[in-house]
From Swiss-Prot:
Name this protein carries in UniProt: UPF0173 metal-dependent hydrolase DSY1309
UniProt entry tagged with the keyword Signal: no
Keywords recorded for this protein, A-Z: Hydrolase
Protein's UniProt keywords contain Hydrolase: yes
Family (UniProt): Belongs to the UPF0173 family.
Any Pfam family: Lactamase_B_2
SUPFAM superfamilies: Metallo-hydrolase/oxidoreductase
Domain of life: Bacteria
GO MF term list: hydrolase activity
HAMAP family from the UniProt entry: UPF0173
Signal peptide start-end: none
Amino acid sequence: MVKMEIRFHGHACFEIIGEKGRILIDPFLKGNPAADVGPEHFTHLDGILVSHGHSDHLGDAIELSQKTGAPLICVFELARLCARYGAKTHAMHIGGKHTFNFGTVRLTQALHGSVFEPPGEEESFTYAGMACGFLIQMDGKWIYHAGDTGLFGDMELIGRRHPLAAAMLPIGDNYTMGQEEAVYAATLLRPNYLIPMHYNTFPVIQQDPQEFSELLKRKFPASKGEILAPGQSLII
């Protein structure tokens, strides 16, 4: 069986390396106190997935698209805005899927907002469409990156229709789900592995990931909690 690597780079940024390609999700690297690498680390990418326009998710995506030639994959409105600043883009929307050279991507809903902050104009906000999550199929495995979201009941449909090898869920609370909601989400999604994200980058989202792992073990032991420090990987 082909092995896939899911490497955490801090906050909500993940690099997924499969047999047919390498993708990066929500590349908030420069200015991220939790990141283990900067954008200069990446010389080849096959896709850059961005869940929404907030600066802690869009991050260095435009620069990386320009440098590597990889398409920035996101909702239509955000794609149009990023293209103005030189990014190569592939626009999609909620519920749609597309097959790329590295695998298949389907956009899911996420309960969150989205604005675009033009490079160098951080006080200027433009509405950037809906926030989203990603269902990614690579090497025959389904991975779910929820983006920034609150808990929603249709996570059960995601889990029912896609046998998830792994899911990345926010646990930071305040802006997204907290620990208890993420554990309940696990009961709906039923992933083999659950990787917490979007916590401890800023004071307002401080959480104890070990506490989350213990809560998951008590409430839903069918999913294995995988706490990754920036730079660490899960091989599946």
